[in-house]
Each structure stands twice: as C-alpha cells, then as structure tokens.
Amino acid sequence: MLVIYSKDNCQQCDSAKLLCQMKGVEYAVKTLGIDYTREQLMHVFPKARSFPIIAVKVKYDGVEMEEYIGGLTELKEV
C-alpha cells in the first residue's frame, strides 16, 4: 500500500491520488496540519523537498514502516 503525504490546495497531490485510482493502487492519504506537522515529516523523510511525498508500507522483522519512494514523477514510474 502506498501512502501519499499531501497538503491542501496541491495540484500535484491531487494528481497523485488520481493516478493511484486510475491504476487501481491501494493508497492512504495523510494531510499536512491534520495528520502530521512539517517538522514531523522532515524528521521521517529528510530528503523530501516538495509535495506530494510518496511512501510505500513495508514490513521489516514484523515491524511496519514507510519507505520513501519520491514524488509524483517517481510515482508515475511505478
């Protein structure tokens, strides 16, 4: 499952959600200011510089984590 870190009024975020819907990819949305703060996001994904931030849920030794994929451009390549 993918996780889309989004923010309000973000056309690229909306495009990422639409792309997932069109491809039939299961995804969850986390919204800035509701589900997380910018500081929390930068702590978890320090290399991310723009929205949306796309992550995939993975399990390592039974622990569920989110692995950074990239942004909309990288999502289009998946």
Task: Identify the meaning behind each predicted range.
Residues 38-46, 77-78:
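Short amphipathic alpha-helix with an adjacent loop that forms part of the alpha/beta core around
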Residues 36, 49, 67-70:
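Generic alpha-helix structural propensity
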Residues 6, 25-39:
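Thiol-based oxidoreductase modules, predominantly thioredoxin-like and allied folds used
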Residues 45-57:
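Structural micro-motif
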Residues 1-26:
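Local sequence-structure signature of Cys/Sec-based thiol-disulfide redox active-site neighborhoods
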Residues 56-78:
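Non-catalytic, surface beta->alpha helical segment in thiol-disulfide oxidoreductase systems
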Residues 12, 37, 61:
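Short phosphate-engaging motifs
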Residues 9, 34, 74:
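Residues that form or immediately flank small-molecule/cofactor binding pockets and catalytic motifs
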